Each structure stands twice: as structure tokens, then as C-alpha cells.
């Protein structure tokens, strides 16, 4: 649905002057995701692209991997006591015969807009085996100068951020820097799920020759989502976590952090970057 922003009264103090004015805020509402009729998770998200979000979430969980695994996604009617539809509950039905991994039964069912899914049973439980190994053949060969341009392209494509200043963004780019898709959400993990879910709905998985760029940091969960979708390159404008770096090294994911102008840190998978012209120094 279209409830992306809301208006609220704010008291503004600037240069000693006080005024009252309406302000535009990003909407944050819960979304319950059900799998074959059974509650699975609740995430705090910005409404919009809810079906894609649910599909992308299930890709990261190893439930869905290709378009044929998905039978249907619907909003659940009667979500309130009076029977009205809040458009905050979706039910994903898998195609008969699609295997459902046990990991879906082990999670803490609450997620937040900042950290994503919390309280997994163990680290091993999150290292779900992907059906899309990172096997880009021939390997991508990306010019670092091209990567350096992507944050500005991401920022220019953010529509709601300009009005609220409160949204994260995730975008898919080709290896040549062409913007394929962008999604905004109060949670960066939701923005990634919306991208991946839309790709699944369009039968575009695996995303084997694209670059995923995220605003903010690169957490373990975002690295996992990239791997589960077959994305070979994850770049972030801020820092990665240690677990994200470990996962990238294990799976062959190219992980770039602190992507700001001509500067960047490459934490894993440097074989996909054209570093021939760079001057190598070690400390």
C-alpha cells in the first residue's frame, strides 16, 4: 500500500526562534509474514512492496530460491477484531513439493527495523546452504572507479529520503554501473529483501552478475542475503561487521566497505576488482 510517509506536528528550534510546523516522517509499521498459513516472523518496515519483501525474506531463509517455488502471496483479511484488513499481514504459499528447511522453525519471530532478525538459534543456523553458489563465470572484473561512482547514483535515485531523511536504500547495479532497481525502507535489510523478492517474482534469480549497494553498514545478515540470492558483490558506504567479513571469505563474496568517493576498503573477494592500475602498499 502507499503509506510511505505521514505528517506530524513538530516544534522547531533554530537560531533561538521557536516555531510549530508539520513535518514529513517515514512510516514504520509491523508486517507479519506467514508461511503456508502459519506465522513465521514480524518485521518493522515501511509499507510498500510487501509481497516482494516477504518473498525476499524467504529467499534469505532458504525457503524460496526460484520463481517456481512460489505459488501465491496474499494479504490476510480479517487482521483486526472488527474484521478489517490492515494490510500488515501477508501469507506466502509455496508450490506443493517445495522443501521447507527446519531453520524456519528455530527463529525468534520478532525483527526490528534496525537490526533485522535477532535471536537465531545459533550461528550455524544462519549459514543456510544456498542453491545459488557464487559462481560468476567468467568472474566479474569491476573497475574501482566505477564502484566509487555508485553511492552518488544511489543517493540521486532516493525519492522518499529527500522528504524524510529517514530511509535506508539498497540498489542493484550491473557490472557496468547501470542502475537496475532501487528500494527504500526504514530497515536496510527490508530494502534488500524487496530487491531480492522482486527479482524472484520476475524469475531473475540468481543475480549472478550484479552489484548490491546498501546505505549504512554491511551486517552479517546483509551478506547472507546477498549470498542466498547469488549476488557476487556487496558494497556498503559504511563499515562491515566481522561476521560479514568471515561469511564473505567463506563463500567467495566480494565485500567492499567505506565506499566514499575514490576511497574504499576491500575485505574479501578482491579478485573481482580490476586492481591492476592501483599502487600496492602494505603497512
Give residue ranges: language-model regions.
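Intrinsically disordered, low-complexity regions enriched in acidic/Ser/Thr/Pro/Gln residues
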Residues: 1-170, 174-175, 179-182
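Catalytic domains of riboflavin
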Residues: 281
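Feature captures the catalytic cores and cofactor-binding loops of soluble hydro-lyases/lyases
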Residues: 189-278
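Glycine- and Gly-Pro-enriched alpha-helical subdomains that act as flexible
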Residues: 156, 160-216
